[in-house]
């Protein structure tokens, strides 16, 4: 059956800021308390979406979540009118106000894990929103994520949107940032690849400096609820040493697409066994795995973390050729730039490299791959997505003007205490739901 991979990028929200909330994410910690530019951040992401859509890739948009989250702040004991809640939180616990104000839902690679209909037992596309329970500012996202996905993918004959797994460390789930899929063609049955950082109920290596956010148990549970074929499901453990070096998700150290795995040599525990298992599973489905392994001598783990070489999008053009979408930081790192030049000239599976300015997102630890959720859809499934979320000239112009109207060009930590920011955000989101035709998506609209 004919199918295409669509990328749904998260629009950066109006409260985009640098609060250093993500322990284990080096860029996030390094830029803590610096001033952010939400308008620039949103436009950088929007331009990436538009350029990829112009190149013929299926490109969708996911709306931001409402921030600051008054629901969280009230749950934490702050009371009164909305402005009073914000003022009390700013005075008594500014770190909690920062968590409630984070625009981290922009990184939709963490929104959910998605299995296409070609892989599932019931022949429907399955979504499991990630519980993101390792970080407070992200653990509050999954309910709104489920609501958004249920709105966009509403046809129960074609789509299943599950609840998130129970938010406990034993089931820590970070979504598609630790998942990829290999296949001969998008519409054919494929091999789903889950990468975890630790296992809750069996002994094994674990990082010592930074936490492993994804558990084996969570990955297995997602695969089981999606009804995946066990012979086409592969699990691998991320090397704990690279987690300690700042690789907080697998998509910071490897990326896959169709029959290609682009990875650092230190990405996995027992890497050869991982490659062999993937190869055997993919062979059974009519494709041969191509592993492009980047040696540590050419690009160190530190180079990978600072440039986000592997937090790239690997996309297939209609003619089957592949393009690697990287942040401009890859061109600013001499080792990575030299490697990419050799890669493009090698006449291998990856024939082209596209470079984007995503500086505002990168300063919070999010590159091209963080900003998108991959959803493989057949023609009929795509037609069932009736909201105005597919990027084109008209939607781009509407969103670009919307950003100009509603977004600030500077937010410093102290600005989160401004009650006007809540009103500005709600006004913007209310208008956005009309642009995207998603109905009353937010609590304040209900």
From Swiss-Prot:
GO molecular-function terms, A-Z: N-succinylarginine dihydrolase activity
Organism: Burkholderia vietnamiensis (strain G4 / LMG 22486) (Burkholderia cepacia (strain R1808))
Pathway listed: Amino-acid degradation; L-arginine degradation via AST pathway; L-glutamate and succinate from L-arginine: step 2/5
Oligomeric and partner information: Homodimer.
Pfam families xref list: AstB
The keyword Transmembrane belongs to this UniProt entry's keyword annotation: no
EC annotation from Swiss-Prot or TrEMBL: 3.5.3.23
Catalytic residues in the record: 174, 249, 370
Gene Ontology biological process: arginine catabolic process to glutamate; arginine catabolic process to succinate
Catalysis: reaction(s): N(2)-succinyl-L-arginine + 2 H2O + 2 H(+) = N(2)-succinyl-L-ornithine + 2 NH4(+) + CO2
Protein name: N-succinylarginine dihydrolase
Residues bound to substrate: 19-28, 110, 137-138, 213, 251, 364
Entry keyword set: Arginine metabolism, Hydrolase
Transmembrane intervals: none
């Amino acid at each position: 059956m004919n199918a295409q991979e669509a990328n749904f990028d998260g629009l950066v929200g109006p409260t985009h800021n640098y609060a250093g909330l993500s322990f284990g994410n080096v860029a996030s910690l390094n830029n803590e308390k610096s001033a952010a530019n939400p308008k620039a951040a949103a436009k950088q992401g929007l331009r990436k979406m538009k350029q990829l859509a112009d190149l013929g890739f299926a490109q969708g948009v996911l709306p931001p979540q409402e921030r600051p989250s008054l629901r969280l702040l009230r749950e934490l004991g702050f009371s009164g009118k909305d402005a009073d809640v914000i003022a009390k939180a700013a005075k008594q616990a500014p770190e909690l106000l920062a968590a409630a104000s984070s625009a981290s839902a922009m990184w939709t690679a963490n929104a959910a894990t998605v299995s296409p209909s070609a892989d599932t037992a019931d022949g429907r596309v399955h979504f499991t929103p990630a519980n993101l329970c390792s970080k407070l500012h992200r653990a509050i996202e999954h309910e709104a994520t489920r609501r958004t996905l249920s709105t966009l993918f509403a046809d129960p004959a074609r789509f299943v949107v599950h609840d998130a797994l129970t938010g406990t460390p034993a089931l820590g789930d970070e979504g598609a940032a630790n998942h990829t899929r290999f296949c001969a063609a998008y519409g054919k049955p494929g091999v789903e690849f889950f990468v975890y950082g630790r296992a809750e109920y069996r002994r094994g290596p674990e990082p010592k400096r930074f936490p492993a956010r994804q558990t084996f148990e969570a990955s297995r549970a997602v695969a089981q609820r999606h009804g995946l074929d066990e012979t086409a499901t592969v699990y691998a453990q991320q090397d704990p040493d690279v987690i300690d070096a700042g690789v907080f998700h697998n998509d910071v150290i490897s990326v896959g697409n169709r029959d290609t795995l682009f990875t650092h040599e230190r990405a996995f525990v027992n890497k050869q066994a991982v490659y062999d298992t993937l190869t055997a599973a993919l062979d059974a489905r009519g494709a041969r795995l191509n592993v492009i392994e980047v040696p540590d001598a050419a690009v160190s783990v530190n180079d990978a973390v600072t440039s986000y070489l592997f937090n790239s999008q690997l996309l297939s053009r209609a003619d089957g050729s592949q393009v690697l979408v990287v942040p401009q930081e890859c061109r600013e790192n001499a080792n990575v730039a030299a490697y990419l030049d050799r890669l493009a000239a090698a006449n291998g599976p990856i024939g082209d490299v596209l470079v984007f300015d995503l500086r505002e997102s990168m300063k919070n630890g999010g590159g091209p791959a963080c900003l998108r959720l991959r959803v493989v859809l057949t023609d009929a499934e795509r037609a069932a997505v009736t909201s105005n979320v597919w990027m084109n000239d008209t939607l781009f112009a509407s969103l670009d003007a919307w950003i100009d109207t509603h977004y600030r060009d500077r937010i410093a930590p102290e600005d989160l205490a401004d009650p006007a920011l809540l009103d500005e955000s709600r006004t913007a989101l209310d208008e956005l739901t009309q642009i995207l035709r998603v109905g009353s998506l937010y609590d304040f609209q209900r």
